Each structure stands twice: as structure tokens, then as C-alpha cells.
């Protein structure tokens, strides 16, 4: 399928909505929804925004977005139901088990942050809470799509087994096989899900540095990560020889402004013949990337459940902040000469400009450009 046709198909799939039914209702706050069951998520969204995210695409939002993936991907067709139930909220139901798996290192922050909401909004299952909180979190990131949200996942009774979460040191083959086993994800869908790395940072790959971003714009949902992973690496933002990390093109930091980290898995997926063209196709294609991510997330978020058994409550997901009106650009001091050898020869690489500046880009630690960020941390068992 040509990429132009693929773009149109993905965009259509991403915006499809269930038609209003006879069960449509008006919630106590006046919001009209397709089903009365969706009303319970309106106060939850308000509580999450005011108490946890504070309307910011910051660390608390980033961590909950990560949690949606780690909770959902823990399912296996080959191992069977006892391996895990997918998007089942088991991270919250078993907060002293799954968060302690090595691949989930650091996820206890988001688990502990959501546990008070699970107790307060106790008519909502933990499984629904995790996926809805992720959709609310993403809405704070300029340029993000408005995610689909299906409600009605039951509470789980068992934790997932260890070993189902892809890790940055895994080979491309192992990653693709894991996604295939989890839910028949195609290589294109795998790359689409990695758009989440444009609003992601790492604390545990290199524990000598805090909140290392994966691109130069970690507070906006844009295509920079797909460009910057294609640049030649020049150094590490912290120590070297860390498992799952390779050299980054923007390692320079200053104070709490940490340099860019490059995951070994991102590097490999951007260069592997099975995925390189998909990776490259997202560079400077904001709408295509956002629509592709939305479609892949719709599939991920219901792993372990039948779509027909769930209720479409997408209309209570907050409308995301608009995209920043800026195309993909090479960071200051970088240009076409800094591109690594491109594996994908079928696509013409877009013509991009470089940001002005004679020194390497410093990536701000906080979305407000400062060094002190708003944040919430609840105590919990994880």
C-alpha cells in the first residue's frame, strides 16, 4: 500500500466513532454522552487534571502514559490466560508484584499516583482507570491525538507474569515477536506506538541522570523523535556502557537540563529493513503520526477484551492542546550532514531547516523552560 493511501486509511480508522445510541444521556454537569455509563469519567478527568497532571505534559503525565503501555502489553497468546490479562489494571491491583519486575523499573511512581484515584472513584475499574488516565495525560501534550476510550473492562484477579514487557536492549526481532504474540501487531503498528517516545523521558536506564528525554521537545507530541533518532550519535548524556542505551546526537546537559538519551531499541528499529521506512515516514508528518498512534493505541488499550463488550466513552476524553505550529527541524548545529546512513531508500527524506544557534541545543527540564517543575508524588505500596 502506498504511504499516501496508508495515511488516508489510518486517518479514517482513527476518527471513526460509534454512533449515538438510544442509551445516550446528559450527565449532571450538562455534558451529552453516548452512554450514561460514561458520566462517571467526567469527575475523574477533572480530578486527574487538577490533582495530578495540573494540565501539564510533564513527568506525572509522561509516567502515566508509560503505565498504559506496560499494563496492556502484559498478555500472551502463546502462554495463555494465566500469563496476564492485557489492559486489566493488574499494575494497580498488584502494586507490590508487577512494578517490581525489572522491565517496570520506575513505574511505581505512576502506580502510587493512581492508587488514591482508584480508591476515590471506586465505581471505575482499575483497568479503565489506567487507560483513561493515560488518555487524559496525553491530552495535555500539544499535538497529541484525542485517544479513543472504551469503558467496561472488569477488574483482574491475577498479576501478569514477568518477561512480557519489551526492553530497550531487545533485538528488533524479539520486539516484533513480542508484539505479535501480545496482539498481532504489525511492524507499522509497533513503530506507531513508539510515537509516545516524543513525550517520554528515562530515569532508570542511566541512574546517574534524572528524566533524560528521548528528543529535544519532550513536552510536545511532535515528530522530532523520528528525526533525531536518525542522527549520528556523538556521546552520552550521563555515564556510558548502560544496558539498552547507545550514543545520542544531543548529549549536552547543564544543571538539571539533561541531555538527550537514545534507546538502543529505537536506534535499531529506525535502521532495520522491516521498520525503517515506517520510522522515516513519520518525519515531519504530524497528522499521519498522530493518527497512526491513535489507531495503534485503540488496539493496545483493549488487549484482553472484546471490543463488543465495551462502551465507547471517547467523548469524555479531554480535547488535546493544539499542535505547536512548527515543522520538524534539525536541532541547532545539526543538519543533513548529521544524518546517519538511511536504511529506507523507498522514501525521499524531507527537506528540513535547522534551528538557529551556534551551540548544541539544551533541552529544558520543565515544560515552562525552568528547572523547577510542578509535580505530585503520593506514597503507596509500590
Curated annotation (Swiss-Prot):
Alphabetical list of Pfam families matching this protein: peroxidase, Peroxidase_ext
Cofactor note: Binds 1 heme b (iron(II)-protoporphyrin IX) group per subunit. Binds 2 calcium ions per subunit.
Family matches, as InterPro entries: Ccp1-like, Haem_peroxidase, Haem_peroxidase_sf, Ligninase, Ligninase_C, Peroxidases_AS, Peroxidases_heam-ligand_BS
GO biological process: cellular response to oxidative stress; hydrogen peroxide catabolic process; lignin catabolic process; response to reactive oxygen species
Entry EC number(s): 1.11.1.13
Disulfide bonds: 27-39, 38-313, 57-141, 277-344, 366-373
Organism: Phanerodontia chrysosporium
Keyword Heme (UniProt): yes
Site residues (Transition state stabilizer), renumbered to this chain: 66
Subcellular location as annotated: Secreted
Keyword Transmembrane among UniProt keywords: no
Membrane spanning stretches: none
Listed name of the protein: Manganese peroxidase H4
Annotated positions binding Mn(2+): 59, 63, 203
Amino acid at each position: 500500500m502506498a504511504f499516501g493511501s496508508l495515511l488516508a486509511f489510518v486517518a479514517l480508522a482513527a476518527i471513526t466513532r460509534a454512533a449515538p445510541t438510544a442509551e445516550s444521556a446528559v450527565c449532571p454537569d450538562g455534558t451529552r454522552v453516548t452512554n450514561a455509563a460514561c458520566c462517571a469519567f467526567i469527575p475523574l478527568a477533572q480530578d486527574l487534571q487538577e490533582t495530578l497532571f495540573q494540565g501539564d505534559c510533564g513527568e506525572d503525565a509522561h509516567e502515566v502514559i508509560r503505565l498504559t503501555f506496560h499494563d496492556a502489553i502484559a498478555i500472551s497468546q502463546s502462554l495463555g490466560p494465566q500469563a496476564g490479562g492485557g489492559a486489566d489494571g493488574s499494575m494497580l491491583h498488584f502494586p507490590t508484584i508487577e512494578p517490581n519486575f525489572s522491565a517496570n523499573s520506575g513505574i511505581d511512581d505512576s502506580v502510587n499516583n493512581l492508587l488514591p484515584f482508584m480508591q476515590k472513584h471506586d465505581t471505575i475499574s482499575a483497568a479503565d482507570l489506567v487507560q483513561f488516565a493515560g488518555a487524559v495525560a496525553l491530552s495535555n501534550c500539544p499535538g497529541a491525538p484525542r485517544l479513543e476510550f472504551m469503558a467496561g473492562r472488569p477488574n483482574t484477579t491475577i498479576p501478569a507474569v514477568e518477561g512480557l514487557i519489551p526492553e530497550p536492549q531487545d533485538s528488533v526481532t524479539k520486539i516484533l515477536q513480542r508484539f505479535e504474540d501480545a496482539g498481532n501487531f504489525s511492524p507499522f503498528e509497533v513503530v506507531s506506538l513508539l510515537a509516545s517516545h516524543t513525550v517520554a523521558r528515562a530515569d532508570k536506564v542511566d541512574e546517574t541522570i534524572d528524566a533524560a528525554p528521548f528528543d529535544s521537545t519532550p513536552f510536545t507530541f511532535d515528530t522530532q523523535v523520528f528525526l533525531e533518532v536518525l542522527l549520528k550519535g556523538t556521546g552520552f548524556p550521563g555515564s556510558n556502557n548502560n544496558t539498552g542505551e547507545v550514543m545520542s546526537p544531543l548529549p549536552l546537559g547543564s544543571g538539571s537540563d539533561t541531555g538527550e538519551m537514545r534507546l538502543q531499541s529505537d536506534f535499531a528499529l529506525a535502521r532495520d529493513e522491516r521498520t525503517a521506512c515506517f520510522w522515516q515516514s513519520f518525519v515531519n508528518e504530524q497528522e499521519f503520526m498522530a493518527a497512526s498512534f491513535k489507531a495503534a493505541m485503540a488496539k493496545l488499550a483493549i488487549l484482553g477484551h472484546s471490543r463488543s463488550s465495551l462502551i465507547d466513552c471517547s467523548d469524555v476524553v479531554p480535547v488535546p492542546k493544539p499542535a505547536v505550529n512548527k515543522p520538524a527541524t534539525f536541532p541547532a548545529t545539526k543538519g543533513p550532514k548529521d544524518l546517519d546512513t538511511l536504511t529506507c531508500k523507498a522514501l525521499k527524506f524531507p527537506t528540513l531547516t535547522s534551528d538557529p544557534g551556534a551551540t548544541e541545543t539544551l533541552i529544558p527540564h520543565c515544560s515552562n523552560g525552568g528547572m523547577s517543575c510542578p509535580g505530585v508524588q503520593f506514597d503507596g505500596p509500590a
